[in-house]
Amino acid sequence: NKQTRLVKKMDKIVIYDTETTNSTIWGSIIEVGAVVVDKNLKEIGKLNIRGRMPEGEVPSAKALLVNSTSIDLLTKGNYSHYDFLGAVENFFTKCAPAMFMGWSNLNFDRRMFHFNFFKGNRYPYALILHQIKNMMVYILQEQLKL
């Protein structure tokens, strides 16, 4: 079927997850872990990056328990939240074209990226556009074969 062919056509798969300060759109992404694998599932890249929480934000106590995050980790990271988002955006851009996937990506992670990029003065549709672009390239390739 077409979904199986799409997976076979992708040269890379990016599997990612986020840690956040809250489970709502008002929270901020504070950590991203990603692994890039080829079509044989061999690791060809990875990202594990943590940024500081934006100033003035109050994290959810429940999120801190889930993330095992201390106040020091939230406030004394190497990257400002803006620089952190830029590094993540650059990594995902370099990975494309690829299939992006994870455990709760559609319901949570992708939505958090959208709102965090928007709040951080970055292009909020960056991750979604990479995925749409990959689908369009595949569809065009399939149409040209007909």
Which residue ranges define each predicted feature?
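Short alpha-helix plus adjacent loop in nuclease-associated cores
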Residues: 131-146
